[in-house]
Regions:
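An N-terminal-biased, well-structured beta-alpha scaffold segment characteristic
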Residues: 1-91
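Residue in the alpha/beta-hydrolase core beta-strand immediately N-terminal to the catalytic nucleophile
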Residues: 69, 142-144
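Phosphate-binding beta-alpha-beta segment of Rossmann-like dinucleotide-binding domains, i.e.
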Residues: 86, 94-142
Length: 144
């Protein structure tokens, strides 16, 4: 049975998916680079987010490793040259954060448009500056 290490915090759904597909999963999220290097030889797969750095030293120590999955868009925390040299496939999820990014962008735009940050700051100081809090209304306008 293939064995995967999840070394960064992920939803428990990830574990369920692996287990439904007869893949043994260990989730160890507090590993130091040295700790990861010591145990990586026991795994066929490694799942990371951005905290774990899959360096050449770690990848080279992973004699059974076949794949590194990055739960996120970038792969800057994975040594791609080392992965290629060691015949390790690297995959990511480039569209996984699209909705969250769009929602965050719209939230920031609305915050700017309605002066929410300034209003919050003033309220915490005990001020109630109605003119600053008013902001602008969207009715009849296009935003974005």
């Amino acid at each position: 049975m293939p064995k995967v290490l999840i070394s960064d915090a992920l939803s428990n759904l990830a574990n369920e998916i692996f287990e439904k597909n007869n893949i043994e999963v260990d989730t160890i999220t507090d590993l130091s680079p040295e700790g990861l290097k010591k145990i990586i030889e026991n795994y066929d797969g490694l799942v990371v987010r951005s905290a774990t750095k899959a360096t050449d030293e770690i990848i080279s120590a992973a004699k059974k490793l076949k794949i590194i999955g990055r739960a996120g868009a970038g792969v800057d925390n994975i040594d791609l040259i080392s992965a290629k040299k060691n015949n390790v496939i690297v995959m990511n999820t480039p569209g996984g954060n699209t909705n969250a990014t769009a929602e965050h962008t719209l939230s920031l735009l609305m915050s700017l448009y309605r002066n929410i940050t300034e209003a919050n700051r003033g309220t915490h100081k005990g001020l109630w500056e109605k003119k600053i809090f008013k902001g602008l209304e969207l009715k009849g306008k296009k935003l974005g």
